[in-house]
């Protein structure tokens, strides 16, 4: 027979896992002049309170009750312990979770509902903390369409009836403080949808760590890492990045190097090896393909399921902190690819999180990306915007990342992106612009720039959307820089042409100067160009092996000497022949081959020239740093221009044919002696050593609207760089 102090309906809802607030039943409650202790123990045979007062099972249920006098109640600790024995004889003692007050404050919930709680990662998820001098973990999750949410894990046998959570008013946020849980415990949320009764088991969207694939559990994580990069962060805040060299080495951590058995290296091991190499090569920054947790290696990290979790493939979150800290201690910045455009449909993660379209847009015409088979975030929902912006700030503030490269921005800006007529919904004005995504990006960039001094935001945006890298107060999107996809596509298309046909494609080299200063551009040669049967960079080149290598050296020079910051994907610097694969390390043995070693040494010298030549970086984003000498010699496929700074000028001359050009006359800005500071045909780089004996003297002959000129030897498929001797 049911105890009269607890209704059958309440117990039924507990048993079915549909009660929205188990605190109304469980814990210690006044009943007239007495008190009742109530606990819910689905696997217990017997139980007691504090080891001295037996609990009695309510017949036919998992509810145990003890009736206490006022005196006994006073002797009972506020947060009492429950002892119980299971059928197999195992004994357990825990502090009841149902004696604690709500831990989430009204301000937290208010800011979150408004989409302005930028440190919500310190509130939601799993927070290791002490409450009333009792240590445990505070769990909180947003699931407004749930009739019940429970914390499940090894600690309770993954039984969703053991630790049901309480709701917080109309916020949709559920919470529960569980005493005794510690960093390292594995957990998930079990969610019952209130309309369909569908039962879901989900990873924590705010989890700071996750299990190694194929396992998908969230891990309670409390960092103990001690940062040592204060000087770096202080200097970064005042860094004049627009007038400084930024040379980015794009890296996929799982395939840069592996151990002898083909397994992943740890973040700490990678840090030691990668930083040494990057410093030797002369790069200023590393850009990591996404390392937020993802289940599928083949996605390269671009289908994220754990937005706040550095992937466990390479170690713990503190191991990743070590990686970033080690880079900073060695003067290397760290950028990260970040994916707020879409997320995968894996059932254990964000997709249909509470049984409804919670993080994604409900209408598939806005909520599904047809090409990628993924969901698109609902940027019009406050809590979703908050999740993403807080995530960006988490990587920048808590993990000390120096900047984010935002993936697939074009797919966010346009409602009809990669959609046929009838497959998309216009905005409220009838247009194709995604107004909610635009406002999200502006808010994101404004908050990053305000809260993270010196952090950079970079857009992979493949259309001609205006003012991507202009401040929000000017009407721009607020990014620091934008990838110049047009330059990359035109350049690679040109280089793939047989030199016989290059005169007919000459405009592909010159056209980018028509828009080069409309944005703050990065010139990328990225991972996307060396996969999916596109071939490795050197394999794209026409001709025999010698010509392919010469073209590769020419491409490296062309990228370095053009205005714009630089990015090169790993393996390109030593002309790896194979397409990149995430399943193996790079072909480092090629660095022992003379031709590949030559390309590597050229890239190293180009990087050194770039870092030590203000003309190559001071005016990347304005026309003062660039002048054509001759952009019209399409018949011979020769280009020449000047890179300019207040301190120096560099003359850059390119020969895009395998025919050496002797006595080739170019105009020069000043009379004097010019030294040949770089020649990509040098035998040091695997070339034929055709050149100009180290220096040239001008003649008083006007040429190309210049006051003087000189004749030089242009090596085949090569670039020559000249600097006037002081």
UniProtKB/Swiss-Prot annotation:
Cellular compartments per GO CC: cytosol
UniProt entry tagged with the keyword Chaperone: no
An annotated GO BP: glycogen biosynthetic process
EC numbers for this chain: 2.4.1.18
Pathway per the UniProt entry: Glycan biosynthesis; glycogen biosynthesis
Active site: 407, 460
CDD domains (alphabetical): AmyAc_Glg_BE, E_set_GBE_prok_N
One Gene Ontology term of the molecular function aspect: hydrolase activity, hydrolyzing O-glycosyl compounds
Alphabetical UniProt keywords: Carbohydrate metabolism, Glycogen biosynthesis, Glycogen metabolism, Glycosyltransferase, Transferase
Entry-linked Gene3D superfamilies: Glycosidases, Golgi alpha-mannosidase II, Immunoglobulins
InterPro entries on file: A-amylase/branching_C, Branching_enzy, GlgB, GlgB_N, GlgB_N_E_set_prok, Glyco_hydro_13_cat_dom, Glyco_hydro_13_N, Glyco_hydro_b
Enzyme's top EC category: transferase
Keyword Transferase assigned: yes
Pfam families found in the cross-reference section: Alpha-amylase, Alpha-amylase_C, CBM_48, GlgB_N
Catalytic activity: Transfers a segment of a (1->4)-alpha-D-glucan chain to a primary hydroxy group in a similar glucan chain
Family of this protein: Belongs to the glycosyl hydrolase 13 family. GlgB subfamily.
Assembly: Monomer.
Function: Catalyzes the formation of the alpha-1,6-glucosidic linkages in glycogen by scission of a 1,4-alpha-linked oligosaccharide from growing alpha-1,4-glucan chains and the subsequent attachment of the oligosaccharide to the alpha-1,6 position.
Classification via NCBIfam families: branching_enzym, PRK05402.1, PRK12313.1
Protein name: 1,4-alpha-glucan branching enzyme GlgB
């Amino acid at each position: 027979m049911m105890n009269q102090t607890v209704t059958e309906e309440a117990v039924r809802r507990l048993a079915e896992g549909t009660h929205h607030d188990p605190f109304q039943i469980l814990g210690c409650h006044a009943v007239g002049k007495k008190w009742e202790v109530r606990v819910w123990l689905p696997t217990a045979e017997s139980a007691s309170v504090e080891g001295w007062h037996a609990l009695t099972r309510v017949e036919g249920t998992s509810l145990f009750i003890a009736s206490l006098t006022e005196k006994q109640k006073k002797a009972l600790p506020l947060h009492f312990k429950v002892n119980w024995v299971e059928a197999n004889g195992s004994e357990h003692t825990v502090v009841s979770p149902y004696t604690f007050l709500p831990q989430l404050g009204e301000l937290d919930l208010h800011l979150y509902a408004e989409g302005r709680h930028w440190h919500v990662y310190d509130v939601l998820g799993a927070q290791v903390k002490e409450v009333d001098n009792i240590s445990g973990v505070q769990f909180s999750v947003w699931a407004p369409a749930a009739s019940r949410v429970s914390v499940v894990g090894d600690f309770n046998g993954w039984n969703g009836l053991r630790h049901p959570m309480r709701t917080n008013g109309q916020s949709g946020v559920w919470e529960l403080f569980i005493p005794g849980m510690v960093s390292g415990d594995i957990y998930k949320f079990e969610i019952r949808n209130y309309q369909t009764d569908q039962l879901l088991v989900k990873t924590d969207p705010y989890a700071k760590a996750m299990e190694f694939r194929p396992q998908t559990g969230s891990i309670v994580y409390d960092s103990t890492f001690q940062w040592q990069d204060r000087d770096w962060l202080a200097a970064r805040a005042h860094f004049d990045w627009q007038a400084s060299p930024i040379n980015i080495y794009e890296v996929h951590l799982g395939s840069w190097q592996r151990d002898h058995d083909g397994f992943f290296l740890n973040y700490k091991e990678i840090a030691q090896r990668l930083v040494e190499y990057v410093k030797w090569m002369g790069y200023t920054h590393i850009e990591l393909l996404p390392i937020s947790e993802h289940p599928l290696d083949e996605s390269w990290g671009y289908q994220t399921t754990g937005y706040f979790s550095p992937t466990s493939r390479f170690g713990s979150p503190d191991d990743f902190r070590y990686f970033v800290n080690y880079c900073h201690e060695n003067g290397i910045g760290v950028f990260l690819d970040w994916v707020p455009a879409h997320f995968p449909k894996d059932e254990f993660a964000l997709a249909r999180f509470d049984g409804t379209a919670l993080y994604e847009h409900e209408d598939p015409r806005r909520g599904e990306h047809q090409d990628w088979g993924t969901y698109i975030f609902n940027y019009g929902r406050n809590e979703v915007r908050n999740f993403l912006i807080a995530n960006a700030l988490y990587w920048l503030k808590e993990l000390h990342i120096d900047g984010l490269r935002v993936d697939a921005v074009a797919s966010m800006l346009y409602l009809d992106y990669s959609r046929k007529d009838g497959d998309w919904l216009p905005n409220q004005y009838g247009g194709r612009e995604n107004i909610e995504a635009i406002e999200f990006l502006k808010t994101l960039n404004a908050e990053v720039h305000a809260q993270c001094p010196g952090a950079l935001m970079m857009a992979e945006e493949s259309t001609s959307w205006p003012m991507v890298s202009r401040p929000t107060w000017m009407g721009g999107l607020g990014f620091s820089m934008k990838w110049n996809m047009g330059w990359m596509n035109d350049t690679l298309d040109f280089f793939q042409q047989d030199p016989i046909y290059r005169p007919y494609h000459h405009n592909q080299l010159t056209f980018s100067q028509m828009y080069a200063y409309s944005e703050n551009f990065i010139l990328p040669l990225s991972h996307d160009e060396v996969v999916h049967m596109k071939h490795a960079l050197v394999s794209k080149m026409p001709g025999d092996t010698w010509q392919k290598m010469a073209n590769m050296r020419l491409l490296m020079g062309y990228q370095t000497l053009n205005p714009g910051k630089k990015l090169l994907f790993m393996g390109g610097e030593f002309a790896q022949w194979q397409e990149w694969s995430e399943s193996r390390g790079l072909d480092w043995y090629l660095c022992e081959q003379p031709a590949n070693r030559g390309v590597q040494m050229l890239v190293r010298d180009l990087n050194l020239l770039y870092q030590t030549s203000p003309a190559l970086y001071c005016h990347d984003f304005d026309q003062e740093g660039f002048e054509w000498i001759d952009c019209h010699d399409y018949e011979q496929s020769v280009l020449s221009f000047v890179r300019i700074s207040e301190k120096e000028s560099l003359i850059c001359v390119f020969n895009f044919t395998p025919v050496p050009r002797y006595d080739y006359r170019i105009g020069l800005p000043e009379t004097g002696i010019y030294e040949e500071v770089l020649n990509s045909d040098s035998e040091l780089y695997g070339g034929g050593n055709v050149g100009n004996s180290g220096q040239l003297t001008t003649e008083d002959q006007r040429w190309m609207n210049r006051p003087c000129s000189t004749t030089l030897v242009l090596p085949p498929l090569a670039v020559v760089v000249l600097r006037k001797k002081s």
